[in-house]
Amino acid sequence: MKIVLLILVFLGLFMPDLMGQPVPARDENIPYLMTFGGGGKRETSWGDDDFSQAFFFEIPEEFTEPVYIRVFDPDIGGETDEINGFWDTKMEYSIYGGKGAYSDPDARETQPENNYRSGTLLATKTFGEDKYYDNNWYTFGPFNPSEGEYTQEYQGHIFKIITEGKGGDDGNLYRYFLSTSFDENIDVEGANAFTYEYSFRMWNTADNISHIYPFIDDDCLSVKQENFDWDNDGWIRVVSVVRKGQTVKVSGEDNWAEEEFNIIDEEIGESLDFQFIKRKTPFVVKNNNVVISVRNNYGELLKFYTIPIGGVPKYKYDIKVREIEK
């Protein structure tokens, strides 16, 4: 995988706007990340299977200026979040760096178990209902990029942020931005972000298609996608440079669906485009929260880069010219 990434960098095959890091990013067209409180009966039918979500920010080693991790709408209340009865939820944001923050195997799994909070805790804050931060930004930092875990594989430093419900049963909808500024969203050149399990809110309109982009490395022969609580809200379609549009199994209310399919040679070293297409009839599903992950044939989780490696994959039509006999 390291070789593939280095080749892509050398050839300039990353997207032209590989800068900064809004999460979700523009090309994903996802309105919000989603995490529920997880208190009481730990009800999962609202669309969150484990009440915890981890994201990783990757900063190239040549970038040495201070960075900030900003959270939009970090509180639980107001007009953006999803109420369940009355606002009673607490949400904790924790940022980790140092040895093991990314490299510990538990940090790269889907469930918040064992040593998933690996690394050195750099900052943490818990929010409840807070009108000041409703539809506003809270900023963690500054952090020296060297405080993240250095990885030779990516030749950069990685920070981990875990957002986790600490009681209550309301839904927290939020976004991140990795910035060079405390009070503005200013890009960190060359940065990227990724997760291994994406928990997010779907749009409430059928004309918006959301995307996630798992990267296929050179050891991948097949992948298995797992999605949770899709509510039969349309289709999940997979597109690549050689895959025109393959639909995969989708889940119903409060359950999982999975499907495995083979990887085509031309997809190695590229990203897949998982497209989330809402149904229009007999009605549009509102406030749909979903969870998805993808594993390779070795059982390893694939990274969902918010800025897809190699760019957004586009199907390449194979136009063949056939000579007509006279």
Each predicted region: which residue ranges?
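Extracellular beta-rich ligand/substrate-recognition surface
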Residues: 41-52, 199-204
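C-terminal edge strands of extracellular/lumenal beta-sandwich accessory domains
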Residues: 21-32, 55, 83-87, 91-101, ...
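Sec/Tat signal peptide C-region and signal peptidase I cleavage site
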Residues: 15-20
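Mid-chain, structured segments of secreted extracytoplasmic proteins
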Residues: 67-111
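Sec-dependent N-terminal signal peptides
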Residues: 3-14
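Extended extracellular/luminal ectodomain segments enriched in beta-structured repeat modules
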Residues: 50-52, 60-68, 216-222
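Extended, solvent-exposed segments with strong compositional bias
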Residues: 41-45, 109-154, 249, 256-274
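A mature extracytoplasmic/lumenal domain signature
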Residues: 63, 71-75, 165, 227
